[in-house]
């Protein structure tokens, strides 16, 4: 079961600030500061969250000032026995500062006399209590408060050691991001709610921020993240596009964030997304986010060594549940199971628990044959929106792997129903489409086509169409599959994952259905460097499976065997996907064509042992038994 988190968990994309300060008189390059909540003495509630968020935006665009992230604040509050959404008073900020080894706290305040406002920003050493820097600005009215705060923050940055040239270069005024205090407050509430209650609860706040300011780029990308985390890919792309169109209104850090999200999830141009992450990491070397997301990209492309390097860099800067889950998952991919278990154990020692960790535990249980532990992980997901459906679909894969198709169908249906209940129709449609692929591969074309029709009727999103096109081609329904492929190639001309993996898979499937194995092998050539990856929507190792089938059709037994042996060589990649067990049958067929009866018998026996409890009457099982009997 593969659960790689980026959008699935969303944590890499949470709005945060980062990167160190540099002046020997105040802060060193590796120091971190903690933002306290604003001391609002005006009685006007609009300032409560808006000004802290505005200050975070202002200080966060600095490549030198590293602010303790919201995620780290929440984790530390839990260790302190407090709720993750507790107010960060000066005393709480000092304790956070000491516990996290930070250097200073930043205190903000606002007071008024009539229509005049005074904004203060102080940096105080958390151990000594000494004031490191102090700024005060006046505003002639509420509309000028954000401008005054921007001036105070810029001056504070220079006093904390940042060069004037840097401050001038990285100084987009917060009022350019949004001039609306109300919008900023709603956005801040969305960030906090998403972190503490989940994505679905955060959406109304992000929508409200956009209603108040239709040019609020950060709110659009925040909403895009929430939708993506809920599997609503079309709405995620729509809002990411709006954020990208408004990217000139944000700081350089946010521009990197928006651009990377846009290229990765709207156009699918992974090369450009990678470039944005690399520039982000270079400009903000203390920010873990670009490293974590580069790790995700490399993993999807099957470049696991690179993925480990980047994910470890993320964890070195700021350990997180997503980082632990992705690192353990990549260790599983490269069969370093001991290190995967150690990584999960370290996460659990820090009380991290969530979908990525549970998905890794499920994968380890599957690889070790521990059915009881697999059941425990699935039970953990029960009743958890956005997580239950993932675990159920993973369990459906396992049932199909062993030929228990009725159970797989039931689990796929339950997974889809769970996703729909969570307002994630696109995700639910994907689970139905995955079942269509299972039906196609075991020889049930009618059931496969019915599942495709159901999935497309529920939510005909891009990823659903990709899976549907594969399933249709594998059942011989070439006309509809080709129509979907043509439309995708027209609408997604730059999408890296589609160009190097999924388009070749669909084209090869069509060629095989048309008895053209030579064309199938040629179609799969672009996938060769990436065939061990699992690009979204995520079915591992389809290219070598189809290439093996093409060689079988050519009666080239040795070449076919070489392809199917890749599955035995990479158990951590294929895991519990149906193709992993079917590859054993196909290996037997390859050996039979080659005239190696002993190896053919062994491979058939291996498959039939895996499927000893399979449902009766499955077409591919009936074929396998008949073929095996002829070898006796």
For every predicted segment, state its role:
Residues 22-27, 167-187, 245-255, 381, ...:
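TPR-adjacent "capping" and linker segments in tetratricopeptide-repeat scaffold/adaptor proteins
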Residues 215, 248-252, 286, 319-321, ...:
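Short coil loop/turn residues that delineate tetratricopeptide repeat
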Residues 194, 228, 264-265, 299, ...:
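Position-specific recognition of the canonical hydrophobic site in helix A of tetratricopeptide repeat
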Residues 1-346, 350-354, 372, 385, ...:
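Acidic, proline/glycine-rich low-complexity intrinsically disordered segments
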Residues 191, 207, 225, 261-262, ...:
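Amphipathic alpha-helical repeat scaffolds
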Residues 186, 220, 253-257, 291, ...:
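Canonical tetratricopeptide repeat
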Residues 230, 262-266, 363-366, 533, ...:
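Glycine-centered coil turns and helix-coil junctions that link the paired helices
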Residues 391-392, 397-577, 582-610, 619-631:
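Helix-coil-helix junctions within alpha-helical repeat/solenoid scaffolds
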């Amino acid at each position: 079961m593969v659960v790689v988190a980026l959008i699935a968990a969303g944590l890499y994309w949470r709005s945060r600030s980062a990167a160190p300060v540099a002046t020997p008189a105040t802060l060193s390059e590796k120091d971190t500061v903690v933002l306290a909540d604003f001391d609002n003495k005006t009685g006007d509630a609009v300032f409560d969250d808006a000004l802290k968020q505005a200050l975070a935006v202002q200080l966060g665009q600095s490549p030198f000032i590293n602010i303790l992230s919201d995620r780290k604040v929440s984790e530390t509050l839990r260790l302190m026995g407090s709720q993750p959404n507790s107010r960060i008073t000066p005393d709480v900020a000092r304790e956070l500062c000491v516990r996290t080894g930070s250097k200073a706290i930043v205190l903000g305040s606002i007071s008024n006399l009539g229509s005049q406002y005074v904004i203060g920003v102080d940096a105080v050493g958390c151990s000594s209590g000494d004031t490191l820097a102090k700024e005060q600005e006046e505003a002639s009215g509420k509309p000028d408060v954000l401008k005054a705060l921007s001036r105070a923050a810029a001056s504070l940055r220079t006093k904390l050691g940042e060069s004037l040239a840097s401050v001038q270069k990285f100084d987009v005024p917060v009022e350019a991001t949004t001039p609306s205090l109300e919008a900023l407050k709603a956005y801040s509430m969305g960030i906090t709610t998403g972190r503490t209650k989940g994505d679905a609860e955060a959406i109304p706040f992000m929508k409200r921020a956009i209603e108040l300011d239709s040019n609020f780029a950060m709110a659009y990308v925040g909403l895009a993240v929430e939708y993506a985390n809920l599997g609503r890919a079309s709405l995620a792309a729509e809002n990411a596009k709006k954020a990208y169109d408004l990217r000139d209104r944000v700081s350089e850090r946010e521009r990197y964030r928006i651009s990377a999200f846009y290229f990765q999830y709207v156009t699918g141009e992974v090369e450009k997304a990678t470039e944005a992450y690399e520039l982000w990491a270079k400009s903000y070397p203390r920010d873990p986010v670009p490293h974590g997301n580069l790790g995700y990209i490399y993993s999807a492309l099957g470049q696991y060594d690179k993925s480990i390097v980047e994910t470890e860099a993320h964890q070195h800067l700021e350990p997180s549940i997503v980082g632990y889950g992705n690192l353990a998952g990549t260790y599983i991919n490269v069969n370093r199971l001991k290190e995967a278990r150690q990584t999960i154990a370290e996460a659990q020692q820090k009380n991290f628990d969530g979908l990525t960790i549970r998905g890794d535990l499920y994968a380890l249980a599957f690889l070790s044959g521990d059915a009881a532990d697999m059941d425990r992980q699935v039970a953990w997901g029960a009743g958890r929106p956005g997580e239950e459906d993932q675990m159920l679909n993973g369990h459906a894969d396992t049932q199909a792997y062993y030929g228990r198709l009725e159970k797989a169908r039931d689990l796929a249906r339950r997974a889809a129903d769970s996703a729909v209940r969570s307002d994630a129709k696109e995700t639910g449609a994907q689970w139905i489409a995955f079942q269509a692929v299972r039906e196609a591969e075991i020889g049930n074309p009618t059931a496969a086509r019915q599942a495709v029709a159901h999935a497309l009727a529920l939510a005909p999103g891009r990823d659903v169409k990709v899976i549907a096109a594969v399933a249709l081609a594998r059942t011989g329904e070439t006309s509809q599959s080709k129509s979907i492929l043509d439309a995708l190639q027209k609408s997604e001309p730059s999408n890296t994952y589609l160009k190097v993996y999924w388009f070749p898979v669909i084209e090869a499937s069509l060629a095989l259905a048309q008895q053209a194995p030579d064309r199938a092998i040629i179609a799969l050539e672009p996938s060769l460097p990436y065939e061990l990856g699992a690009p979204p929507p995520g079915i591992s190792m389809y290219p070598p499976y189809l290439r093996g089938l093409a060689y079988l059709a050519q009666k080239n037994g040795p070449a076919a065997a070489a392809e199917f042996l890749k599955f035995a060589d990479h158990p951590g990649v294929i895991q519990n996907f149906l193709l992993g067990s079917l590859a054993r049958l196909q290996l037997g067929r390859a050996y039979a064509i080659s005239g190696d009866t002993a190896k053919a018998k062994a491979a058939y026996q291996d498959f039939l042992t895996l499927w000893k409890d399979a449902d009766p009457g499955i077409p591919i099982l009936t074929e396998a038994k008949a073929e095996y009997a002829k070898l006796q």
